[in-house]
Amino acid sequence: MGLSTATAKNLFVCLSFFLYLIFTIVPWRPVWAQNHKPAVSYEEKKRQANDIAVTVVVSGISCTCARFAEDIRNVVNDLGPDGIRVLPVLGVGGLQNLNDVLFLKNIDMAVVDEDNLRLLKKKDPALYANVEQRVQYITKLYNSEFHVLARNDIKSYDDLKDKKVNFNLKDSQTEVTADTVFDSLKIPVQRSYYDNDEAMKRLLSGDISAMIILTGAPQVTMAKVKKEDGVHFLPLDQDSLPNHDLHGLFANYLPAEITHDLYPNLIAEGTTVPTIANRALLVAYTWPENSQRYNKIAKFIDAFFSKIDQLNSPSRHPKWREVNLSAEMPGWLRFKPAADWLAAHRNQAVSANPDSTPGQSSPELRLAFQKLMQNYASSSGRKTLSTKERELLFARFIKILSESKAEAAAR
C-alpha cells in the first residue's frame, strides 16, 4: 500500500528539517567547543595553586597559635596567580612542630617556642647538632603564659604531690615546659596526656586535680570556666613556693602575670596570678637561597610584615599587641629574608600595636632605663640580672611611662 500525499509531504518536511540540523548546526559544534576551552589547562592550574601556597604548622584549634595563623591567613591571602596563600596545618605543638618543619616534606613554617632548640640539642646532640642552621626564626609572635588550673582543694604546687595532673599531649609545648617546671620543683605527680577539652571535663568532674596549658592568654577553654566551677589558677613565684629555688626556672623563662582582664570569671578584679612565660616564634625551614620554596617564604614574609599594622584590630587576638617584628631572639638565627626586610624598612612600623614601639629604643629612654637598673641594684642588693629579668623590668618601665603619659594627657 503506497503512502498518501499528506504522509509523503510530512516525511519530506521532517527529512528537510533533519538535513537542516546536520548542515547548519552540527558544523558549528567544533567552533562552539573551541570557544569554551578552559582559560588554563589542568596542569597549569595545578602549578599555579602550588606556586603560591606556603604551609605553617600550629597546635590544636584552642591554641593561640592557631588563632594567629588564621589571622595571618585572613590578612595575607591573595589567591591570584602571583599571590600568596597561607595554609595552616593542625599539629601537636612544641618539639613535634619543630620536628615537622625539619622532617616533613610539605611543611614550610611552624609556630614553636624559644626553648625548643636548646631542648632538642639536649635530647639528641648528634641528630640536632646544626638545627639552628636548618630552622631559623622569622619573628617572635607573643609570650605564652604557663597556666595551671587546679581544683580549690589544691592551694599550691606542693599540694599536687602524687596527684593526677594533665600535661596536655605528648611532645606538646605544654608537656615540654611542664616537665621542666615539675622536675625543677622536684614535685612528683601522676601525669596524664589528654587534650584540653577532655582534661577540662575530667578536672571539673574531679577525676584529675589540675590541668596545664602553655599558650598566649586568654586561652579559650579556660576562659569558659568560672570560680563557681570550683577551680582556680595556681601562682608560680617565690612567695607562693618559699621552700623552692626558682632561679633555674627564671633563668630560662620570663616572669609573667595572668590578670583579671584576661580571665574575669576566674581572677578577681585588681588581682593577678604570677607565673612564667615562654616566647612563641614563627620559624621557617632554611631552603637553599633562591630556590622555589625559599622564594615563596620570602614572598610571604614581605606580605606579612608589610601588613602587620592591619592585625591590630579588636577582631584579632589581643596578643597581636605584643608583636614586635624587630625583637631579637638569643640563641636563634634570623631567617635571611626576614632580616633583609627589616633592614630595608627601618623607618616603617614593625609592631601591630602603634603605641608599643615608637621611641622604645631611643638613647634617652635607654639611658633612663639604665638609671632605673642602677637604682634597682642598689636597693635590692643584686648586682646582676639575667637577660629575661632585664627584659621584664624594661617592659614594666615602658608600661609605667605609657600610663604616666596617659594620666598627664587626661589632666
Regions from the language model: what does each represent?
Residues M1-L11:
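N-terminal secretory signal peptides that target proteins for export/translocation
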Residues V13-P27:
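Bacterial N-terminal signal peptides
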Residues H36-V111:
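N-terminal (or domain-start) structured segment
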Residues D51-L79, I84, N143-S205:
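Bilobed "Venus flytrap"/periplasmic-binding protein-like clamshell domains
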Residues R73-N74, L87-A129, M200-R202, Q219-K226:
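Pocket-flanking alpha-helical
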Residues E114, D124-P125, I187-N290:
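Pocket-lining segment of extracytoplasmic ligand-binding domains
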Residues P274-A377, K383:
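Segments of small-molecule ligand-sensing domains
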